[in-house]
Structure formats: structure tokens, C-alpha cells
Amino acid sequence: MTAEEMKAAENGAQSAPLPLEGVDISPKQDEGVLKVIKREGTGTETPMIGDRVFVHYTGWLLDGTKFDSSLDRKDKFSFDLGKGEVIKAWDIAVATMKVGEVCHITCKPEYAYGAAGSPPKIPPNATLVFEVELFEFKGEDLTEEEDGGIIRRIRTRGEGYARPNDGAMVEVALEGYHKDRLFDQRELCFEVGEGESLDLPCGLEEAIQRMEKGEHSIVYLKPSYAFGSVGKERFQIPPHAELRYEVRLKSFEKAKESWEMSSAEKLEQSNIVKERGTAYFKEGKYKQALLQYKKIVSWLEYESSFSGEEMQKVHALRLASHLNLAMCHLKLQAFSAAIESCNKALELDSNNEKGLFRRGEAHLAVNDFDLARADFQKVLQLYPSNKAAKTQLAVCQQRTRRQLAREKKLYANMFERLAEEEHKVKAEVAAGDHPTDAEMKGERNNVAENQSRVETEA
């Protein structure tokens, strides 16, 4: 029965008592949710916890009174399965449906609106009957940009509400697939933020941080959240490959949050993390290094309880972290972020040689030649022996000349085309105001013929 057929059928069942029938699909087998399939769906897949599902539905009381229908609104209803956004019976029943399936669901009050009901249409302790058609379902998008780069589908819900934070120690069992080929199967224990050293994609780590203990999920990764444009030779993954992971979070131990750490702990951990970040940077693992330096900033940025001697160490760590963040951003070609990190460093030390130089490099990379030149000139003013700044200043001036030459040529061509068009217009106007010799000769002949004709007629 299609959505249209459902609407036609409901008109003939406005007040007819509805029978209690169907297969008991309630978890407790207490006949709280009964299901009858009216039309089989297609395929074998059913929605998983967290999936976004799209349905049409009509709801009746047991006496046949219709109390709601998405068909009347001519708009499908959507919700996230298993998140408590709808009545319990729906979370249970829709999880058993296939795309295209139409079913009747009979819901006891404890799986519907309970003793309170939903005034004014649904009375207290009401048993309800729904007809539901499932149109589609899709996994949960975990990306901040909502670009579909990390999609999660939960096979088995975890326990509790706690999730791993940055720096947490996690124990996972995983399987990685490229198309249908199993390329990775491991049980690992590692610190969140260091997955790259174990050849784990950044998108998988992000997904793990959204999981609960015991959760078993499927994670789908677009190339930019997997192994990107370079692929992964170890696993024979080609460039621009989409991946699928089956991952189970067996256990985890959360890292201390900033507010849980004493000042001494923050200072101690910052020194450890700084060394780790430097090691990652030397290995060319810039994203991992970036995460380490960000930790230092988050721990020390607004901490004011240090002693005078400690404050000097904190100042040095903050300055080094912003400078190192800028360098990581430059390596990753995130030039706006590099400029921002340099600005933060220069707020701490306005004449810092590395801060000025790296900001100049970032400005140069995005063709802001005036700003780049100003930074390199200030470096040379403060540190005349800086050969790299002299070289970059020369590069900056050379590129400025090239740009001016290109602009000059562009404008010259533009003016030349405008002049040609203007000349063409003038020529056309002139041709229109002054007939050609041939046209004038033709006109004189016509006048002579007309005059001869007039004389003959006279």
C-alpha cells in the first residue's frame, strides 16, 4: 500500500474499531508493540541506531478515530532512530523495517504516550495504531561542516553517556574495508590524537570520540577524512579512496580535562606534550604535532594561578606553542590559521623574529605582497643578519613586479580592445551618415529616371 493508498483507506476507516493483531516485536515480549507487514520492503538492510529515517504515517485510536497523519501535511516525517525523539514503539518498530515497507504498528500505552496521553487528541492510557511507510534512511553525519565526510551507523548501542576526550586512552577492535576488501584488522590500545602514528585515518579517530563504551559502529569515510590524495601504501589504498570501518570501543580512560588539572600538572604535561609535538613535527606528522601544541594552548591560555617564576615558563611555553602551531599550519598550507597563530605569538612578543618571519611567509603564500614585505622588512630592521628574510623580501619584490607587469599587460589589452570597439562604432556611425559612391550613383540614376517619367507623362 503506497502513501496515496494509505490516505484513501483512512477515509473509509474513520470510526471503525481496529483489531489487535500482529507479531510481538517488543524487547520484553509483553505484547507492547505488535507489527503487521502490509507490504514487503526491498533489500536486506534496516535502519540502525542514530540513522535519519523518513516516513509517512497515519495514527488512529482503537475506536478508529484518526488523530494525526503526515499525509495531510503532504510532507514526510523524519527523525533520528533510537534517540528518544519519538515514542518507544516507533524506535522499536521502524528499526525492523526495510525501504518501501508498509506496516501496521499497535502500541500499548507504556510504549506510546502512557498515563498522561497527549491532549487534546490522545487520551490517557491509550493504545494506538499506526500505519507507517519507510521511504529512506541514512547514517549520522559526524562532521562539523555536515559535508558527509564521516558517517556513522550504530550496530550496537554502548553503555552510559561518557565518551573519549582528546588524549583519552582507548581500546578498540577494528576492521577496515576498501570496497569489499579487508585491508586492516587489529585490536589496539592508543591515545586519542596519536592514531596517525598507527596508520589510522583522522576521520576514524573523530568517530571514536563520539562512541560510548561497548558501542559497535560502522564508519564510512570520504577521502579527505581517510587517506586523502596520497592513499596508504602499507594497505594498498589508492589515492582518493572511500573507506568503511567496523569498530568496537571495548574500553577507554578519559584524559583529565583542563579544569581537573592543578597548575603544576598543567605545566608538567605541557612540557611533555611539547617534546612529543616536536618529535611528530620532525617526522613530518604535522597534524599530530598540531594537536599536541593545541593542548598546551588550551591548558595555559587563561591560567592565572602560577607563581612569578612559573609565569616565565608559562609565557615561554605559550609563545613556543603559537610559533609551532604557525609552522604546522604553514606545512599544511592553512595560511589563514598560520597568520592567526603568528598574531597570537606577536601579542606575547611583538618583536619576535620567528613570529614576524612566519607571518610574512603566510602573507606571501596568499599573495598579500604589501603585508609580506612589511613583515620581512621589520625582521631585517630588528635582525639585520637574517638571510632568509633578505631572500624572502627579494622574492616578494620580484613577485610584486611580476604582478604589476601582468596587471599592466591586462589593462593594456583591455584598453586596446576598448579602443578597437570604439573605433569600430565610429566607423559604423560614419558609414551610416555618409553613403558610399555606389549608393549615391544609384540614387542619382533613380532621380533621373523619375524625372524622365514625369516629363513623358506631361
UniProtKB/Swiss-Prot annotation:
Phosphorylation by CK2 results in loss of HSP90 binding activity. The PPIase activity is mainly due to the first PPIase FKBP-type domain (1-138 AA). The C-terminal region (AA 375-458) is required to prevent tubulin polymerization. TPR repeats lie at residues 270-303, 319-352, 353-386. Residues 1-24, 428-458 are annotated as: Disordered. Immunophilin protein with PPIase and co-chaperone activities. Component of steroid receptors heterocomplexes through interaction with heat-shock protein 90 (HSP90). May play a role in the intracellular trafficking of heterooligomeric forms of steroid hormone receptors between cytoplasm and nuclear compartments. The isomerase activity controls neuronal growth cones via regulation of TRPC1 channel opening. Also acts as a regulator of microtubule dynamics by inhibiting MAPT/TAU ability to promote microtubule assembly. May have a protective role against oxidative stress in mitochondria. The modification Phosphotyrosine is found at residue 220. Pfam families: FKBP_C, TPR_1, TPR_2. Residues 267-400 are annotated as: Interaction with tubulin. The modification Phosphothreonine is found at residues 143, 436. It catalyses: [protein]-peptidylproline (omega=180) = [protein]-peptidylproline (omega=0). Its EC number is 5.2.1.8. The modification Phosphoserine is found at residue 452. Residues 50-138, 167-253 form the PPIase FKBP-type domain. This is Peptidyl-prolyl cis-trans isomerase FKBP4. The modification N6-acetyllysine is found at residue 282. The lineage of its organism: Eukaryota, Metazoa, Chordata, Craniata, Vertebrata. Inhibited by FK506. It is an enzyme of class 5 (isomerase). There is a cross-link at residue 441 (Glycyl lysine isopeptide (Lys-Gly) (interchain with G-Cter in SUMO1)). GO terms for cellular component: axonal growth cone; cytosol; microtubule; mitochondrion; neuronal cell body; nucleoplasm; nucleus; perinuclear region of cytoplasm. The gene is Fkbp4. The modification Omega-N-methylarginine is found at residue 373. Homodimer. Interacts with GLMN. Associates with HSP90AA1 and HSPA1A/HSPA1B in steroid hormone receptor complexes. Also interacts with peroxisomal phytanoyl-CoA alpha-hydroxylase (PHYH). Interacts with NR3C1 and dynein. Interacts with HSF1 in the HSP90 complex. Associates with tubulin. Interacts with MAPT/TAU. Interacts (via TPR domain) with S100A1, S100A2 and S100A6; the interaction is Ca(2+) dependent. Interaction with S100A1 and S100A2 (but not with S100A6) leads to inhibition of FKBP4-HSP90 interaction. Interacts with dynein; contributes to NR3C1 transport to the nucleus. It comes from Mus musculus (Mouse).
